[in-house]
A protein has these predicted regions:
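Conserved N-terminal structural module of periplasmic/extracytoplasmic solute-binding proteins
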Residues: 23-106, 110, 121-127, 170, ...
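A structural signal for short loop-to-beta-strand junctions that line the ligand-binding cleft
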Residues: 87, 95-96, 123-162, 190-194, ...
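Extracytoplasmic/periplasmic solute-binding protein
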Residues: 145-149, 154, 178-230
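Glycine-centered hinge/linker elements that transmit conformational signals in sensory
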Residues: 183, 224-258, 305
């Protein structure tokens, strides 16, 4: 080969190599190209600390299925959340979604929410949720605003090994309950742990003592301001509650107002210092977490609040958590996509698994639940009525008065006649003020 031909061949080879390298580089650039940014859907919620089970897993499930969207779940503790939602709802750039409590809490902010009726119909959610749940939790002023996410049940959670050791059976009547408490006290064990540092846990005692002794219609009247908190039926509740305190059936050191519901009261039950606590089914996740590793049905179990008056039909108590969309949300389409996923059986099954809650979605089968969750579901089915706890059943300004009154009562049980009189007067004024603010059409 002459020198010129050889030089040409080498040049051609060099050019081909350069082209191949360039193509390879382009290929590598294509492979490593930064994907377009995902649109963020902000979801502000209150599922924190001991109540956080399932929220991250559920959010991740959405993000895995929607590469163009990112559900950003941002948590605040309960009290901070109550303030934050009021402050941010009316701004020009609120989060796309909020968690919230069904009942009076949602009713109090409905003017700031986006109706979900069109999305509801498109998604066929009337088939996904029970009519009773839709009516109680989702509908306000004839429109749907609230997507149900969890349903919890308030019951006694007890140290089963301790009960078995002392040959005690879960009580079904008030007389049996008092006998169990007396037996525990005689053995030096605190019968009932109450951690009311955050105020709201004490309300369950007021609620159930009222619902087991007074007609359900009276409770509805009380929650709506048609009955007063110094009514004899209410005072009888405080008198019965006081008798339990006087007998030493609650923890006194630390005092309930100084004790957390989880690391305080629950852990007293876990350690065997107390036998039981009145709390929600989020305790299923708490007692079985990595720290405690209790097995439901073996180490701990639950029983319903005992019957007091056989003439009073059973009412089950608990919250329904869900999701609302503010009417000022910027990305309503993206928020709607997120709501479709969060309403699905897949998402609600995930949340139920980690939180201990029952899934409102009817398409979640019984096989998805643990044995204790299935038994909880049966208790709910046996109750003619399911209602929300005190602070979710009455307007927020009245609820705050009540929670303060319960805390004051725990500190000064003998003062309940004065506490109920003052609560009655202050609640009447709050109800009047609430009625004076006419809802927007």
């Amino acid at each position: 080969m002459d020198p010129e031909m050889r030089a040409g061949t080498l040049l051609l080879a060099a050019l081909l190599s350069a082209i191949l390298l360039a193509l390879a580089a382009c290929s590598r650039n294509d492979d490593t190209a930064v994907p377009p940014p995902r649109s963020s859907i902000t979801f502000l919620h209150y599922f924190t600390d001991s109540l956080s089970g399932g929220i991250d897993e559920m959010s991740q499930g959405f993000n895995n299925q929607h590469p163009a969207l990112e559900l950003k779940a941002i948590s605040l503790d309960h009290e901070a959340f109550k303030t934050s939602i009021q402050d941010t709802l009316k701004t020009d750039n609120p989060p796309e979604l909020y968690s919230y409590w069904a009942g009076a809490r949602t009713a109090s902010i409905v003017d700031e929410l986006e109706p979900l009726d069109e999305l509801w119909q498109q998604a066929g959610w009337d088939k996904a949720f029970a009519p009773s749940v839709i009516k109680a939790a989702s509908e306000y002023r004839g429109k749907k605003y609230f997507l149900p996410l969890t349903q919890h049940y308030i019951a006694f959670f007890y140290n089963k090994k301790l009960f078995d050791q002392l040959q005690l059976q879960p009580p079904k009547t008030w007389e049996e309950f008092l006998a169990v408490c007396a037996a525990l006290k005689a053995r030096g064990i605190t019968p009932i742990a109450l951690g009311a540092r955050d105020k709201w846990p004490a309300q369950f005692w007021f609620d159930y003592l009222l619902l087991r002794t007074a007609p359900y219609s009276f409770r509805q009247q009380l929650m709506s301001g048609e009955a007063r908190f110094d009514d004899p039926q209410v005072r009888a509740v405080f008198a019965r509650w006081k008798s339990l305190i006087d007998k030493g059936y609650f923890n006194s050191r630390p005092h309930p107002n100084e004790l957390a519901w989880d690391s305080g009261a629950n852990d007293m039950v876990f350690r065997g210092e107390a036998a039981m606590t009145l709390m929600g089914t989020w305790n299923l996740a708490y007692f079985s977490n990595n720290t405690h590793q209790w097995q439901a049905g073996k180490d701990f179990d639950f029983f319903p609040f005992p019957q007091i008056d056989p003439a009073i039909p059973t009412v089950a108590l608990g919250p329904i958590d869900g999701i609302v969309m503010p009417k000022r949300a910027h990305d309503k389409a993206g928020a709607g996509t997120a709501l479709r996923y969060l309403a699905s059986a897949e998402a609600q099954r995930t949340f139920s698994r980690y939180s201990g809650a029952l899934a409102p979605n009817l398409q979640v089968p019984d096989s998805a639940y643990s044995d204790i969750q299935r038994r909880v579901r049966k208790e709910l089915e046996r109750s003619p009525v399911f209602d929300f706890a005190f602070d979710l059943a009455t307007p927020p300004p009245v609820a705050e008065l009540g929670l303060d009154a319960f805390a004051e009562f725990l500190a000064f049980p003998d003062a309940y006649p004065e506490i109920t009189r003052r609560l009655a007067d202050e609640a009447a004024a709050r109800f009047s003020a609430t009625r004076a603010v006419k809802p927007a059409p």
